């Protein structure tokens, strides 16, 4: 009997030893510093001495994936596995996906990779921008509307903390573009505003918060995407200004970010003809990559254009030598039409390296990008030492991020870190301090003068495919405060009958709320605008002099298209925190203190904001 017990004990012990050791994420990752440690450089150099040319090239490429569930026999999984095992790519950029599916997929790729992968994501508005069921922070312009950079710092810290818990080490944020063009279709509320010094203050705060929490922050989109009227997902934007103007406006927040130690800078597909006038022409259709980032409206093709910044050694030298940036330079996605209209993926990859880039982000065809660089080295167009220079930066960053010791993200810590109470609390706090009352000629705000039983009609207009739920957070919170509203949502599919019904219902209401969801929608022709059916209905109600309370849950410049709105309130986004904050402001439950970080040309200057004290103590 004793022998049997001893035998059983030995079997159990063997089984326990055989179990894989699950690495635990440290309570707080070490702060990331741009200058690599001596240990990181030593390790990077040791790897480079052992690497083949192909492995060195692979380190420079970061491929994109929507982090959803992928069966191991699926085409998408096989394609990703091919990049990891055959091209030895150095990183992955994550797009929309579920939390656990994302981490499991990344962990599997980390296991397959010979060298640790650097995982990145666009987390400008927090983890919720890419991971389902996590919290979205308000857009940068809302953060700036509070006037308090400490919110940006706290947002950066929380974003990095959640990113690391989700297996992401590099954040493609903050956006440091100065949005001084009201017609900008892609930056808009993603910017901290139009004042270079203010943008710099908030960008530096976010950067310091994020890197203190152990992630690489990435200032984007150099040399500046704010004064453009073309979305680089659809075409090549141009900023036709000279160096003096760039030094005093566009470069200010980039220089401040560099001085603050930002780890990376993303260069955008932006033409600067007064800086680099080298002409580029569209490729023949048979050589172009298929557009991946545009809607049915298609690409915007300029027959005569100047060299994109991502391909320009002149602009690369400004960043390296004039702004003295020694860190990692990342291209904007090489799949974007602002680049693919003019360059093949092979040529784009080589030119990006010639322009000073270190990371080749999301090629439309990673095999082609790899092949292009490989052939350029073999032909002598670029040297292997040039490839090593960028690979060294990326490898050293991986070491200092702790990926050499621990590349696998523990699953069991995610629900203790991601979405903790301080995350929605901060989103709510920012939102409630951001709400901006620009105009209130009829004294409609707050709704204290609304009589019991009054009919309130909400005309919601959206530029998204979300009519079934887009206004829910707003109207639900109003109802909790005792204001019930009838809502009709109009979008670009709305019929004439639906428009007429909305107009008729509005005309019988005691108060009309016009909720305008004209949001940034990258690659979409209607980005930051409102669809024609909704615009037609709102214009008819303004003409009929209906009592209208206009709210922008997105683009703050919409008042320019509807100057007849006598009351206009700006929330800068459609996040639940912002919709609920507006509802609370209308109910008189919170102070209204936000101020415009931008001017509304011809209407209101930057800094406008009517201050109203709360009237309710709920």
Which sequence ranges carry the predicted segments?
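Bacterial N-terminal signal peptides that target proteins for export
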Residues: 1-9
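Bacterial N-terminal signal peptides
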Residues: 10-18
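Preference for extracellular/luminal or secreted protein segments
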Residues: 23-82, 311-312, 321, 342-618
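Second-shell residues forming the walls of enzyme active-site clefts
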Residues: 49-52, 76, 92, 101-117, ...
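Short glycine-enriched loops at secondary-structure junctions
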Residues: 66-69, 121-129, 169-179, 219-225, ...
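Catalytic domains of carbohydrate-active enzymes, especially glycoside hydrolases
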Residues: 78-95, 157-171
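Active-site-adjacent structural elements in enzyme catalytic domains
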Residues: 99-118, 125, 149-165, 387, ...
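A substrate-binding/cap region within the structured catalytic cores of diverse enzymes
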Residues: 146-168, 175-196, 200-203, 207, ...
């Amino acid at each position: 009997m004793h022998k049997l017990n001893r035998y059983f004990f030995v079997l159990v012990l063997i089984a326990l030893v055989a179990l894989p050791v699950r690495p635990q994420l440290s309570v707080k990752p070490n702060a990331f510093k741009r200058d690599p440690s001596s240990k990181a450089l030593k390790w990077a150099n040791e790897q480079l001495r052992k690497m083949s040319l192909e492995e060195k090239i692979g380190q420079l490429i970061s491929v994109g994936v929507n982090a959803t569930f992928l069966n191991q026999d699926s085409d998408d999984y096989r394609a990703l596995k091919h990049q990891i095992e055959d091209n030895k790519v150095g990183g992955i950029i994550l797009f929309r996906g579920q939390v656990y599916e994302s981490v499991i997929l990344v962990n599997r790729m980390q296991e397959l990779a010979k060298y640790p992968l650097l995982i990145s994501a666009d987390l400008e508005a927090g983890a919720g921008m890419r991971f389902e069921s996590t919290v979205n922070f308000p857009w940068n312009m809302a953060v700036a509307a509070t006037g308090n950079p400490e919110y940006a710092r706290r947002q950066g810290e929380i974003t990095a903390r959640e990113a690391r818990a989700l297996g992401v080490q590099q954040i493609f944020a903050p956006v440091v573009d100065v949005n001084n063009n009201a017609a900008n279709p892609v930056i808009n509320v993603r910017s901290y505003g139009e004042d270079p010094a203010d943008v710099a203050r908030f960008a530096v705060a976010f950067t310091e918060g994020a890197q203190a929490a152990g992630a690489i922050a990435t200032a984007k989109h150099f040399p500046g995407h704010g004064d453009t009227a073309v979305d680089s997902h659809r075409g090549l934007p141009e900023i036709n200004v000279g160096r003096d103007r760039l030094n005093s406006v566009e470069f200010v927040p980039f220089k401040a970010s560099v001085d603050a130690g930002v780890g990376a800078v993303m260069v955008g597909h932006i033409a600067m003809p007064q800086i680099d006038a080298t002409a580029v022409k569209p490729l023949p259709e048979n050589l172009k990559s298929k557009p991946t980032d545009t809607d049915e409206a298609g690409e915007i093709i300029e027959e005569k254009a100047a060299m994109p910044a991502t391909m320009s050694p002149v602009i690369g030298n400004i960043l390296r030598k004039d702004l003295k940036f020694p860190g990692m330079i990342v291209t904007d996605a090489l799949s974007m039409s602002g680049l693919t209209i003019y360059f093949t993926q092979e040529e784009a990859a080589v030119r990006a390296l010639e322009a000073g880039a270190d990371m080749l982000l999301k090629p439309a065809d990673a095999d082609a990008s790899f092949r292009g660089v490989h052939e350029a080295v073999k032909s002598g167009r670029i040297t292997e030492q040039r490839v090593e220079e960028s690979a060294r930066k990326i490898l050293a960053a991986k070491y200092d991020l702790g990926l050499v010791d621990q590349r696998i993200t523990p699953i069991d810590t995610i629900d203790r870190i991601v979405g903790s109470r301080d995350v929605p609390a901060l989103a709510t706090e920012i939102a409630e301090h951001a709400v901006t009352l620009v105009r209130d000629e009829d004294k409609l705000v707050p709704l204290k003068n609304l009589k019991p039983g009054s009919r309130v009609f909400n005309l919601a207009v959206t530029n998204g495919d979300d009519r079934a739920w887009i206004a829910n957070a707003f109207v639900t919170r109003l109802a909790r405060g005792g204001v019930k509203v009838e809502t009709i949502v109009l979008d670009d599919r709305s019929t004439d009958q639906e428009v007429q019904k909305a107009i008729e219902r509005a005309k019988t209401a005691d108060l009309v709320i016009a909720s305008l969801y004209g949001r940034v929608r990258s690659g979409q022709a209607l980005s930051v605008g409102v669809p024609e059916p909704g615009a037609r209905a709102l214009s008819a109600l303004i003409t009929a002099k209906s009592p209208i309370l206009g709210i922008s849950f997105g683009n703050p410049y919409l008042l320019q298209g509807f100057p007849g709105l006598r009351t206009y309130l700006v929330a800068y986004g459609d996040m639940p925190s912002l919709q609920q904050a507006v509802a609370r402001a209308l109910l008189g439950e919170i102070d209204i203190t936000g101020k415009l970080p931008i001017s509304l040309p011809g209407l209101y200057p930057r800094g406008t904001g009517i201050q109203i004290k709360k009237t309710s103590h709920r």
